[in-house]
Each structure stands twice: as structure tokens, then as C-alpha cells.
Design a protein with these regions (language model features):
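Bacterial N-terminal signal peptides that target proteins for export
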Residues: 2-13
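Bacterial N-terminal signal peptides
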Residues: 11-22
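Rhodanese-like catalytic fold shared by cysteine-dependent sulfurtransferases
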Residues: 26-53, 60-194, 198-337
Length: 337
């Protein structure tokens, strides 16, 4: 049976299966590359095939409580298992070759990453982006994650799964990785790129500072928080409108539809994590040259020579006062012992 036969179009009904959501989609927008996403049915029909590996992107403890039967774990959340301690990709690609080969992934393997909820959605997209950066052309994400699997009436298993080792060789696709020098050139007006800031509005405005300085990259094209590029729904428990952990073409088109798909387009955030979701949306929409900026604001905002729009400095004096107050409270508590 062919891949096209197995892959079923993702409909609004599939989104409604996620449980506590209630929203209306027009269905006007369609993904240009829909096969990057898979449905529970596709996973169920293929998971036991030797050339398919399904990766649970949650913590090992969550995996042990219940996972898709046949799915493997990388031992920790994907965004930690696939990057170094500074949340950056390993530049030594042999580490990826060893890691993926050990869990049974070869260059001919269809790899499906899935998440548990909104918190781990970007773990799956981190995995997706890294594999595309490594040149793997058979990588997918289970849209709706574990919730979609459950709502489709499928069972979970708590038995650990280990695949036979395989050989994986990286074929780096450098264009998927945006270096800081490229962003700096855009900020200084020397290079033209479409920059998507996937941080929150407060981060963009410098009101939420997560580096030495807050603010934004000059010449940024658009600021769309990663949550704002998802469909919204009414949470029946809280009564509030919230983003749904489901990649929806209408929501993505609303966020990025006015951008030029033929131009190089780079997504970034604070650590290059949230922006991997934006990167995947760009791939789904058919952007010709999308990239993720791995170093993102955490590196840029701490480089004092780099230009910043709406620049705001971190209040170290205020932090020092808070620390002194805390020290006094601790001293009092210790004195009572």
C-alpha cells in the first residue's frame, strides 16, 4: 500500500477529536505539504513496519506511564535529548548519527515525532527541524499528538520498546539553519530576509526581558507568538479562549499568509525552540527557503554591539534588591532554628 493511500487528509473533525475544544474552521486554507503531518490511522497502520520509527517526545517517566504501542523514547524530552545543555544543536553531527542509529533510525526510515500536549508540542517540532537540518526527508509529526491517538479510540502501552540498531548518515542541509551572522546582516540593513519573531508581544516590546537586553531585531518582518499561529478554542473547563495543540492551515495562513513564500524566511524566538513550530508551519505552507535561527534572542540580546529595536536593559539593581531581601529572610529563618 502506498504512502499516498495511507495518508488521509486531516479534517476539522480530526481537530474536534482533541476533546475539550470547540472551534469553527472555514477549511479555506490547505497545506502545500500535508504529508509532513500524519494522522493516528497512518501511525497505526505503519508503526510495526521495519522502516517506521515513532518517537515519544515526552519525559521518560511519562512514556513509562503509557505511550503509543511500538513507540520509542529517547530517554528524555526531545528538546533535551537532541540538543546540548545550552539548548543548541550539536555541531558535531556524528553525535546525531550515533543517537539515531542506536534507536533504529536509518536514512530510509520514516520517523514520526509525537507530543503529549501543548507543553511538548515544540519538542516534536524540534525533532522535526533537526532531522530536516540533517537532510532526512522522511520525517513527520503526529498532528494532535497523544490526545488525537486516544480520541481515535486507540490504546496505550507501558512496555518499553527497543529497536534494532541501524546506520544513519547525516546529509546536512545547511539552509535550514540560520546563523547569527545572517541575522545581524539583516538587522544592519545589509541583507534582506523575512524574519518571523515567534516570541510574545511583551518579549518583542522589551517588557519581558530574558537576556541582558530586551527588545527586537531591527527589520523584523512580523511578530507572531507561536501560540497565536494556532487555532483558538474555548476551553470548556475554564471558559477561556486558548490555543489548541493542533497545526491548522487556516490559523497558519492567517498568521503568515501575507508573506512571500519565494523568499528566504527565518523564524526565531528566545532559544530557537518555539520557532521550530513556526518553521514546520512554513514547511507545511510551501515556503521555498525556510530556516530556524537556533541561537535566537538569548545570544543576540546579550551581544552589546548588536543593534536592538525598542531596547530595554535588564534591571540588575532591582534584582540585587530582591536578592538582599531574600538573604535577610533566610538569615531570620536560620536564626530561629
Amino acid at each position: 500500500m502506498s504512502w499516498n493511500t495511507l495518508h488521509k487528509p486531516i479534517t476539522v473533525l480530526a481537530a474536534l477529536l482533541l476533546g475539550t475544544i470547540s472551534f469553527t474552521a472555514t477549511g479555506a486554507a490547505k497545506w502545500a505539504n500535508p504529508s509532513l503531518l500524519v494522522t493516528p490511522d497512518t501511525v497505526k497502520q505503519n508503526i510495526n513496519k521495519p522502516n517506521w520509527v515513532v518517537v515519544d517526545c515526552r519525559d521518560l517517566k511519562d512514556y513509562a506511564k503509557g505511550h503509543i504501542p511500538g513507540a520509542i523514547s529517547l530517554g528524555k524530552r526531545c528538546k533535551k535529548a537532541l540538543r546540548d545543555t545550552t539548548a543548541r544543536v550539536w555541531r558535531d553531527t556524528s553525535k546525531y548519527e550515533k543517537l539515531f542509529g542506536k534507536v533504529g533510525i536509518s536514512n530510509n526510515t520514516h520517523v514520526v515525532f509525537y507530543y503529549g500536549d501543548m507543553k511538548t508540542l515544540t519538542d516534536a517540532t524540534v525533532g522535526f527541524w533537526i532531522m530536516e537540518y540533517l537532510g532526512h526527508d522522511k520525517v513527520h509529526v503526529l498532528n494532535g499528538g497523544l490526545d488525537a491517538w486516544r480520541k481515535a479510540g486507540n490504546r496505550l502501552d507501558n512496555k518499553p520498546v527497543k529497536k534494532a540498531a541501524a546506520t544513519f548518515k547525516a546529509k546536512i542541509k545547511a539552509s535550514r539553519y540560520a546563523p547569527t551572522d545572517e541575522i545581524l546582516s539583516v538587522a544592519r540593513g545589509k541583507t534582506v530576509r523575512q524574519l518571523i519573531d515567534s516570541r510574545t508581544k511583551k518579549e518583542y516590546a522589551g517588557k519581558d526581558i530574558r537576556a541582558i537586553r530586551g527588545g527586537h531585531i531591527p527589520n523584523t518582518t512580523v511578530n507572531v507568538s507561536h501560540l497565536d499561529s494556532l487555532a483558538k478554542s474555548i476551553n470548556k473547563k475554564t471558559g477561556k479562549m486558548e490555543a489548541v495543540a493542533y497545526l491548522d492551515p487556516d490559523a497558519a495562513n492567517k498568521a503568515f499568509g501575507k508573506l512571500d513564500k519565494s523568499k528566504r524566511t527565518i523564524a526565531f524566538c528566545q532559544t530557537g525552540t518555539r520557532s521550530t513550530m513556526t518553521y514546520m508551519q512554513l514547511r507545511l505552507m510551501g515556503f521555498k527557503d525556510p530556516a530556524n535561527w537556533d541561537e535566537s534572542w538569548r545570544v543576540y540580546g546579550s551581544q552589546l554591539a548588536f543593534p536592538v529595536g525598542g531596547e530595554q536593559w535588564y534591571n540588575f539593581a532591582g534584582l540585587n534588591k530582591k536578592l538582599k531581601k531574600l538573604e535577610k529572610k533566610v538569615a531570620k529563618l536560620e536564626g530561629k532554628k
